[in-house]
From Swiss-Prot:
Keywords: Amino-acid biosynthesis, Cobalt, Diaminopimelate biosynthesis, Hydrolase, Lysine biosynthesis, Metal-binding, Zinc. It is an enzyme of class 3 (hydrolase). Zn(2+) 2 binds at D100, E135, H349. GO terms for molecular function: acetylornithine deacetylase activity; cobalt ion binding; succinyl-diaminopimelate desuccinylase activity; zinc ion binding. Belongs to the peptidase M20A family. DapE subfamily. This is Succinyl-diaminopimelate desuccinylase. The keyword Magnesium does not apply. The lineage of its organism: Bacteria, Pseudomonadati, Pseudomonadota, Gammaproteobacteria, Alteromonadales. GO terms for biological process: diaminopimelate biosynthetic process; L-arginine biosynthetic process; lysine biosynthetic process via diaminopimelate. Zn(2+) 1 binds at H67, D100, E163. It comes from Shewanella woodyi (strain ATCC 51908 / MS32). Its cofactor is Zn(2+); Co(2+).
Length: 376
């Protein structure tokens, strides 16, 4: 097995790029891509480093998308090896970001190098959209780069996001869509008072409980063949002063929807407001739109991905829309077809994150075959 993808993955992991830091990861990638004829454009927005690299001027435009930032390491004492000192143990590469997603970044670069060497006059264009703000607040990362590209009418045809999509073996699952995400921050207003004199107070917890129960039990939709039913989850709830003899003056509730294409954010918001109003609550509420649902159906990108995985691994893949959000939510609204394909996700965001070394080579081969099927 070639060592080039492993070596690059180790070089990337050794840089402690805890979000929103990049720590030179994009420079390392840019140097490799520039040698293949890519034009490199650094886009820095506040604390976030982004890279747009493109080879070719014509369409169609295939774009690898990913992030160089990683989540914090957590308790260092629980790591078997230093998280930013990547080592191979029993066939697995250990280190923060090994699976999410520096292994994918290395595979993208090496696959592109191999493809360009074999097909220097390929059709269309290849691009890389890389950010250091995917694990953080996602304000100055991919969304800002997309805004820049849209402003100059630079359109992505197909995008492959290197998020760790696989579950048990490489390529068993690809993400061909994601649910939308909507967060609500709700404050139920009451009147603070002494618990011995409830008639002089107004307990917001008691008032809110029936409404929250109705929201939790509500069936928002039935989903469809591509998406599970919309889910509502209360993520945080806080009320009271910490004293046992004080009725609180307010109750704060944070909740989140992961919603299908059967509803819109506007529909969900109105249904929530109707329930709160029906219970006669005095409340304040604000909303955070985290991303719209998207779906990539049958077509060149999904077909190429299926065929590549079958050719490289010998197994069929299962396109799904489950799981959390990714930066694909910012790319899809431009009209691009978006697929996520990456390593097994069993250890992502955990201590002792790792990826199977042989999977890095298989992933590289998958990426290269996808390029060949789309641009040759």
């Amino acid at each position: 097995m070639s060592q080039e993808v492993l070596t690059l993955a180790q070089d990337l992991i050794s840089r402690p790029s805890v979000t929103p830091l990049d720590e030179g990861c994009q420079t390392l990638m840019a140097e490799r891509l520039a040698a293949q004829g890519f034009e490199i454009e650094s886009m820095v927005f506040e604390d976030t480093t982004n890279m747009w690299a493109r080879r070719g001027k014509e369409g169609p435009l295939f774009c690898f998308a990913g992030h160089t930032d990683v989540v914090p390491v957590g308790d260092l004492n629980r790591w078997h090896t230093p998280p930013f000192d990547p080592v191979v143990i029993d066939g697995y590469l250990h280190g923060r970001g090994a699976a999410d997603m520096k292994g994918s970044l290395a595979a993208m670069v090496v696959a592109t190098e191999r493809f360009v060497e074999k097909h220097p006059d390929h059709n269309g264009s290849i691009a890389f959209l890389i950010t250091s703000d995917e694990e953080g607040p996602f304000i100055n990362g991919t969304t800002r780069v997309i805004d820049t590209l849209e402003a100059r009418n630079e359109k992505i045809t197909w995008s492959l996001v290197g998020e760790p999509s696989s579950t048990h073996k490489l390529g068993d699952i690809v993400k061909n869509g994601r649910r939308g995400s909507l967060t609500g921050n709700l404050t139920i207003n009451g009147i603070q008072g002494h618990v011995a004199y409830p008639h002089l107070a107004d307990n917001p917890i008691h008032k809110a409980a029936p409404a929250l129960d109705e929201l939790a039990r509500m069936k928002w939709d039935n989903g469809n063949e591509f998406f599970p039913p919309t889910s509502f989850q209360i993520a945080n709830i806080n009320g009271g002063t910490g004293a046992s003899n004080v009725i609180p003056g307010a109750l704060e509730v944070m909740f989140n929807f992961r919603y299908s294409t059967e509803v819109t954010a506007e529909i969900l918001i109105q249904r929530v407001l109707n329930i709160l109003d029906a219970h006669g609550l005095d409340y304040d509420i604000s909303w955070i739109f985290n991303g719209l649902p998207f779906l990539t159906g049958d077509g060149p990108l999904l077909d190429a991905t299926r065929e590549a995985i079958k050719q490289v691994t010998g197994s069929d893949t299962d396109p799904q829309t489950s799981g959390g959000t990714s930066d694909g939510r910012f790319i899809a609204p431009t009209g691009a077809h978006v697929i996520e394909l990456g390593p097994v996700n069993a250890t992502i965001h955990k201590v002792n994150e790792c990826v199977k070394v042989s999977d890095l080579e298989l992933l590289t081969q998958c990426y290269e075959v996808i390029l060949e099927k789309l641009l040759c």
